[in-house]
Amino acid sequence: MHPFRLPRRAAILGSGAALLAAPSLRAQGRFPDRPIRLLVPWAAGGTTDIQMRALAEAASRRLGQPVVVENRAGAGGVLAAQQLLNERPDGHVLAQLPISVFRHPQMAQRALFNPLEDFTYVIHVSGYLFGVVVRADAPWRTFAEFLDHAKANPGRLNYGTPGVGTSLHITMEQIAQMRGVEWVHVPFRGVAENMQALLGGQIEATADSSGWAELVQAGRLRLLVVWSAERAKRFPDVPTLRESGIDLVSASPYGLGGPKGMNPEHVRVLHDAFREAIFDPSHVAILDRFDMAPWHMPPAEYTAFARKQYAEEGEMIRRLGLRL
C-alpha cells in the first residue's frame, strides 16, 4: 500500500488557496479592530475616574487599540450600566460596574435592568478605601463624638456621598440604624462636588473613597474613621469602624462588564489584557495612591460573585427599608 498523495498540481493550487485565504481569515477574526469605549459612572477627576484612566491606558498597550474613558456621572453610579443596554455586544464597549448596580434595581419601583441577566461580567478589578471626613475646624475629633452629636441632635446633622444607593450611602444608613441615630443624606454627582460642598460648609461631613486623602494630609480635612478591615497604611492613627464598636467592613468591590451576549473569545481577549493591566506597575501606583489593591476575578468567578452580591444587597435593602 502506498500512502495517499495529492497530485503535485492540486497540492500547489491548494496551498496557494490556503495562503490567499489566511490573511482574510486573520483580518476577519482580529479583535479589537477599533477603539474600545470604557464607560465610567463617576465624574472626571475623582478616585474612580483617575484609576480607570490608568487602567485603560495600560490595557490599550496590550490590546493594540485605544481604550477611551467616557464619564456617565449621576444616578448613584448606574448610568454606565444602563448605557450598556443600548450597546452592541461586540466587545467594543465596557463599563465599570460598581456595587450600586446590584442595589438600584432592588430599590426602584420599576427596575430599568436586571444585573443577573443584562450584562456580561468580564473581570473584577478592585475595591475602595472608604472613610468619613469633616473639616479640620469641626468640633468632632473622633467618630464617637460625631455619633454622640448626631444622637443628641436627631435629623440636624447631614453628610454627603457620591449618590443614592452607593456603598457610602448604604453604610452610613447601616451605622445610623445600628447606633440609633438620625441624620440627613445629601447626594452629589461625584467626589469633586462632594468635597467642594464640605469645604464650603454646605454639609458637615462626607463619606467617600480616599479622594479626600490629600486634603487630610494637607490639614484641611480630618479623617474620623475608615471602613476597611485593617487600618489604612497612610493613616495608621485612624481607627476602623470595628475598632469604633461598629461591626461593619465596606470596600465596595467592582469590575468591568459589557452587554449581554458577548462572544466568549472576545471576553477572553479583554479579560487577559485587563488582567495584565491591573498588575501593570503604572496602574498599581495609582491604586497605592488611593490606598486600594488589585482584586482580580476571571469571568466565571466574577459572575458567581455578582449573583452572591445581588442576593446579599437585596437582603440588606429590605432590612433597611430603602427605596429610591
What are these regions (language model features)?
Residues 1-17:
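N-terminal secretory signal peptides and thylakoid transit peptides that target proteins
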Residues 27-117, 156, 181-207, 215, ...:
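N-terminal (or domain-start) structured segment
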Residues 33-35, 177-181, 264-324:
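An extracytoplasmic/periplasmic, membrane-proximal ligand-sensing/linker region
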Residues 43-45, 99-100, 135-140, 161-166, ...:
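Short coil/turn segments
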Residues 86-92, 106-193, 253-286:
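Hinge/capping helix and adjacent helix->loop/strand transition within the periplasmic-binding protein
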Residues 156-238:
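Ligand-binding pocket segment of bilobal, Venus flytrap-like solute-binding proteins
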Residues 212-279, 308-311:
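C-terminal lobe and pocket-closing loops
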